[in-house]
């Protein structure tokens, strides 16, 4: 209320005195003698997760605890990665390199067609392009070493 009073040039003390009178008049059922309009009852809109197909919806505890649907037979171009720390399983295309330090430090369980592929080693992303070589962050490097040790 004080902000409006300063905007319109009214002394804040006077505005504070007027505020309870205005509030009582507006809140009172017959204060201004105006008819009370019944507002339309708004229906709650569905959440975005309810509108998505089940396979695109957010993960739920039920999906995490129940055995997930298995993709059989494995596509030769896919790899199954299992992260030891949280027990999640990710399917990753074999054509894309694993360039994130935590991803390359995770334990890999490969499908039968991908058992003989070379594993991703540290710095493999930087070896591909020499022109955009950036120094590796020491914090990420230390975390990748920690993940490899566990």
UniProtKB/Swiss-Prot annotation:
Sequence ranges of Basic and acidic residues compositional bias: 124-136
Pfam families: Folate_carrier
Matches recorded under InterPro entries: Folate_carrier (IPR002666)
Signal peptide: none
GO MF annotations in UniProt: vitamin transmembrane transporter activity
Single GO cellular component term: membrane
Superkingdom as given in the UniProt entry: Eukaryota
Positions of region (Disordered): 118-137
Family, similarity comment: Belongs to the reduced folate carrier (RFC) transporter (TC 2.A.48) family.
Name recorded for this polypeptide: Putative solute carrier family 19 member 4
Species for this entry: Homo sapiens (Human)
């Amino acid at each position: 209320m004080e902000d409006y009073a300063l905007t319109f040039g009214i002394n804040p003390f006077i505005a504070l005195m007027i505020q309870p009178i205005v509030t009582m008049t507006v809140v009172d059922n017959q204060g201004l003698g105006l008819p009370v309009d019944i507002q339309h009852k708004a229906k709650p809109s569905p959440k975005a997760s309810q509108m998505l197909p089940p396979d695109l919806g957010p993960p739920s505890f039920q999906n995490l605890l129940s055995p997930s649907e298995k993709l059989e037979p494995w596509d030769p171009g896919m790899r199954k990665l299992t992260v030891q720390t949280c027990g999640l399983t990710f399917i990753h295309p074999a054509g894309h390199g694993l360039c994130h330090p935590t991803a390359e430090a995770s334990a890999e369980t490969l499908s039968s067609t991908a058992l003989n592929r070379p594993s991703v080693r540290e710095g493999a992303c930087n070896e591909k392009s020499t022109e955009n070589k950036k120094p590796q962050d020491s914090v990420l490097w230390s975390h990748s070493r920690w993940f490899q040790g566990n």
